[in-house]
Amino acid sequence: MGAPRVVAKGMGEVARRIRELGAENGVPLLEAPPLARALHRHVELDQEIPGTLYAAVAEALAWVYQLTTWKKSGGQYPVPPQDLPVPAELVPEVVNG
């Protein structure tokens, strides 16, 4: 088994549709713009994530695992991770306008 792979990506309307399909299918949504931007910029579809993003993706996947456990067992809702460790050089600048 290799590293996690990017299975969908997009910007604007495509990203909105991905989120919409996820919601319709019960897929948890984690808001992590720096990680999303780094993955979008540096990883192609069906490509494994680079080692430099392992820690950030591992934290996100750990939260998903906690959600799965919570759904089965109840208890306190898992706190989504904040400030995922995404190397600054991988996060593209956001240009408005």
What are these regions (language model features)?
Residues 1-97:
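Divalent-cation
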